[in-house]
Amino acid sequence: VYIDPGDVILVESPTFVHSVEIFEMFEAKCIGVDMDEDGMKMDDLEAKIQKYHPKMIYVIPTFQNPSGRTLSLERRKKVAELSAKYNVLVLEDDPYRDIRYSGEDLPPIKCFDTVGNVVVANSFSKIFSPGVRLGYVMAEPETIHYLTEAKSATNSHTSMLPQVLCAEFFKRGYYPAHHKMLCDLYRQRRDAMLECIDKYFPEGTKHSFPDGGLFTWV
């Protein structure tokens, strides 16, 4: 919908490799933005916006793949501010936000979007079933229109069966207990992994300690 050959997309460094592959399939150029413990660094982001004039900023703000880091509240506000200041689209990919073990939920970048430049993409595959490839988008009506047209041109529509199954799952109230089970299970796996890293990896090895999600960075 938005990408043309030669467009620049700013991405976190590191980021989800499959997204980079998709962007490059449409002949876009991906430029990495430095990160620290609070996610994408805003000074580097603004400098690269000024230098490369990107079409889009791609960010995974919560429990990022692959680092496990979470973009801080102030930086979420700043991303929205820079998006408005330089008129750059933001693709906020946020499929891990509901898999939280501790800490407070942070509002999406979209909450601070004053000009309609932020598009949120989310997924049911992480919280319902990995085999059910369903997701959703939150965006301005015009953007939804173009995305719907593009979706129709690729495969007409997503199969109705997984859509109905997912809808009924939530409608019948199964999600709260399922969500608790998921978080308990993944928390145990995180703790076991970090314990093994501390015990068996070479002395001096450092790792992130994510409050949720499916990733840690060693």
Give names to the regions the model predicted.
Residues 40-101:
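Active-site phosphate-binding strand-loop segment of PLP-dependent enzymes
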Residues 1-8:
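Phosphate-binding glycine-rich loop
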Residues 7, 28, 55, 85-89, ...:
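A short helix->loop->beta-strand "cap" motif at the edges of active sites that frequently abuts
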Residues 10, 29-37:
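Short beta-strand->loop structural element characteristic of the AMP-binding/adenylate-forming
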Residues 167, 184-194, 204-218:
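Conserved glycine-rich beta-strand-loop-beta hairpin in the small C-terminal domain of fold type I
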Residues 111-184:
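Conserved core segment of the aminotransferase class I/II
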Residues 11-28:
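Substrate-binding/gating loop at the entrance of the active-site cleft, primarily
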